[in-house]
């Protein structure tokens, strides 16, 4: 008895040949398969499975039968014993090796269903051929092409290890966070892959490697909002979505404070936003974020400009604070100059009142020419586009009109000369002098503008009648000194309108 080969691959045909002779060595010719079967007491082919039991006569008493190599094993034999024999005969030794890995028999499994980025994923592959034989040389067969572990990479220096029974293991490192992931096994010749159980990779702890603190406005004004964003990611760049508690006290911004009512809010993709408030001017200011002992600096640096506003008004040698309410009075030709905080220059702004009758030149000098009955808003916009708009508002309550030197006449005539309004009293024009000096205060014409003679021809007369009288004598107002005294004869007319 003999086999056609000494080595087989599982699934291959295995041909057994027996030579039947009588005791004198004569070949037994012409035996049918049925006759041979009737003689057989036992017939076995190690590691093989029968395809059929049909014996086929060849020549010289040789008969063959074909089985299929099946179970992988070494040192196998085929054996035969006829009923008349005292012992069996055996073939030479042969071996059966496993066949190619079969998709229907092989598996791939991940050791968990949930990982944290940076965790080790143990992948177990079992390789079997179509006959269920364990494949023992998988270490050389498995590679990055036929085994793919989604969102993970092989751990450096870690290779496939054979554990016996067709089982192989290797460690991978989880990196990109995602749900519904799997590992795939697709050996050569397979039309599609086998898949492991699904698993999820979650982000790891916040890491300084990719996290950022971003200043979203690099130039703001004192008191203005400063928007800030933070990007929180783990070592692998995965967005961290549970960082609100970490950020509460983790961010420092120079010359900036927390804005009341504002908190960090998560906007997605690991990005958090918050609005702070700039409280003090400064240049090249810095910021940082410090979490669990590590620190990263915000980018870019930023500047806080001073909040510029009108600090005071310069009026004919006197300054009024912007909060004093100047001007309450006005006349055609009245002038005053805006003085800004932080020693800022008026020439660095483009000034406008946006209404006819109010002119503002490049030096911030305001000239009134027409009565404006509503509130006036003067705006200065920075020429370089940096900083806040400077805004000054005022409303004229009393508008004075000089009738000119040519109007000089008696009080009775002047008293009826005001087409609009009426003749003002002395105290509407100026307060009484103290120590010979008329006070410069808001609320009276001379108190606000001083020597009215300095305003061109607006007050060309020497004096003007007032409605104030003492013992039947009316007072005359001196536009140069601001002093009113009892007078007779003629004087010029001055009218006031109220708004």
Language-model features: where?
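Short, structured beta-strand segments at or near domain termini in extracellular proteins/domains
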Residues: 377-381, 385, 391-398, 465, ...
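Short flexible loop/turn segments that cap and initiate beta-strands
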Residues: 13-15, 20-55, 119-121, 127-158, ...
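A short beta-strand micro-motif common to beta-rich folds, especially ectodomain repeats
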Residues: 75-82, 180-187, 284-292, 373-384
